[in-house]
């Protein structure tokens, strides 16, 4: 079997606070990656400068605001047959890339792979609640739909993503990951691997509140599943 080429795409908007830690984890633990592309999504801070300081990283610019537009630019600017997406406030575990390679090598029908978030900056009580969500509620949702994607922790086959027309630029934030998963499910297998953990900040949970954030994610997930479109069109940038 030919060696899998994995391109890593990281959308970034005003991420000067987090991007360095993210890229340090990527360059330390992503040795098997084919390339690393940071998409500066019209940042007004030092995001571009900081990312460009990593010799292993290529920085490109997308002036159209929105994570779907930034991800699509990353697809266009990358060349791997497998494209992985994480967020700029994440920290990559050392086994993450290896888990991707294993899953895609053993299953030719697999077109999309995702896994859970683990928040590295929340209380012990919050960690228990989040563990319950991933261990129970997320499993039920996946069994019901056969697809689930976490926007800052997923991987796709380029061929499959191109087949569905890429990301929907009309969806700015909420529901964009479920929209992508739902459409990819029509062309192949979408797997949610509980072992494919990505560490991330809890800035949105802290900025909007645990329950409000959970509600918005849940209601837009259900709306995408049953109507094919999200309910919430506006979102707040929390940095």
Label the model's feature ranges.
Residues 24-33:
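Short, acidic, metal-binding catalytic loop of nucleotide-sugar glycosyltransferases
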Residues 1-25:
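N-proximal low-complexity "stem/linker" segments adjacent to membrane-targeting elements
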Residues 25, 40-48, 90:
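A conserved acidic beta->alpha catalytic loop
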Residues 62-78:
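Glycine-rich, basic loop-to-helix element that forms the pyrophosphate-binding segment
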Residues 173-180:
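Acidic donor-binding loop at a coil-to-helix junction in glycosyltransferase catalytic cores
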Residues 95-125:
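Conserved donor NDP-sugar-binding/catalytic core segment of glycosyltransferases
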Residues 83:
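Short aromatic/hydrophobic "clamp" motif used to bind/position activated sugar donors
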Residues 114-121, 127-151:
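Short, flexible, basic/aromatic active-site loop/helix in glycosyltransferases
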């Amino acid at each position: 079997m030919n060696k899998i080429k994995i391109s890593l795409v990281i959308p970034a908007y005003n991420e000067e606070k987090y991007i360095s830690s993210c890229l340090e984890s990527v360059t330390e633990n992503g040795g098997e990656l084919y390339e690393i592309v940071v998409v500066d999504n019209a940042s007004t801070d030092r995001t571009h400068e900081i990312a460009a300081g990593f010799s292993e990283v290529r920085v490109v610019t997308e002036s159209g605001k929105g994570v779907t537009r930034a991800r699509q630019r990353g697809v266009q600017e990358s060349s791997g047959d497998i494209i992985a997406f994480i967020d700029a406030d994440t920290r990559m575990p050392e086994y993450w890339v290896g888990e991707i390679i294993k899953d895609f090598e053993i299953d030719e029908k697999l077109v999309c792979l995702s896994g859970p978030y683990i928040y590295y900056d929340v209380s012990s009580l919050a960690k228990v609640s989040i563990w319950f969500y991933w261990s129970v509620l997320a499993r039920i949702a996946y069994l019901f739909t056969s697809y689930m994607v976490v926007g800052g922790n997923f991987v796709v086959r380029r061929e499959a993503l191109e087949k569905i027309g890429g990301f929907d630029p009309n969806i700015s934030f909420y529901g964009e990951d479920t929209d992508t998963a739902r459409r990819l499910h029509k062309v192949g297998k979408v797997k949610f691997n509980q072992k494919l953990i990505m560490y991330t900040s809890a800035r949105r949970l802290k900025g909007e509140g645990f329950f409000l954030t959970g509600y918005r994610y849940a209601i837009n997930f259900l709306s995408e599943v049953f109507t094919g479109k999200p309910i919430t069109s506006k979102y707040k940038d929390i940095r």
